[in-house]
Amino acid sequence: GTQLTMRVRHAGGIVGLDVTQGLPRVEELFESRTPRVLSPIAEIAGKVEVTETEEGYKVVVKNTAIKPPEEREYMIPLTSELKVKDGDLIAAGDQLSSGYLDLKEVLLVRGLRGTQKYLIIEIQRVYESQGIQISDKHFEVIVRKMSDKVRIDTPGDTMLLPGELVDRMRFQEENARVLAEGGEPATAQVAILGITR
C-alpha cells in the first residue's frame, strides 16, 4: 500500500513538472505576447522558391495567377527548420519555418477566425503534450474574450475617439445609431488583447 502511494505521488510530481515547462508558452498565448522564436507566415498564396545564402534561407513566394503578379521575399536564419520547400504551392497564412507565429501578423493575414483557431490549436498542443485533455470549448470562451475589443481608426460622427479600445458591441451600436441619423460611421481594427488587460 505504501509503495503504491509513493509511486502515485512521484508520477504526479513528474506530470506537474512537465506542465510547468509548457506554461510559459500558454502564458505567452493568453497574454498575446510576441514569441521569442518567430516564424514568418506567407502574406500571399503562391509558389515557393528557396535559395540558401550566407545570410540564411531566402524564401520567395510568387503568385502569378493574378495580374500584375505578386511576390514576397522572406529571409529565414539557417538555424531555423523550413516548413516549405522549393516548388511548394502554399496558401496565404501558411507558416514558413519552425517557431511560433506573431498574433498580430496572423490577424492581418488569416483574419479573426483564423487567429482564434491558431490560439486554440497552440494552447491545446501544450496541454496535450503533457497528456492533459481539455475540451476546446473552455479555451474558446477565453479566446473569444481576448478578441471582443476593437481599436478605433477613424471616429466618423460617433462619440468614439481615435485609438480608443471599445467592446465590439458598443462599436456596432454606435455605428448603427450614427448611420440611422445619416452620419458617417467609425472604422476600427480587431484587437487581440492579453487576458489581464
For each of these PLM feature ranges, what is it?
Residues 2-197:
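Intrinsically disordered, low-complexity regulatory segments
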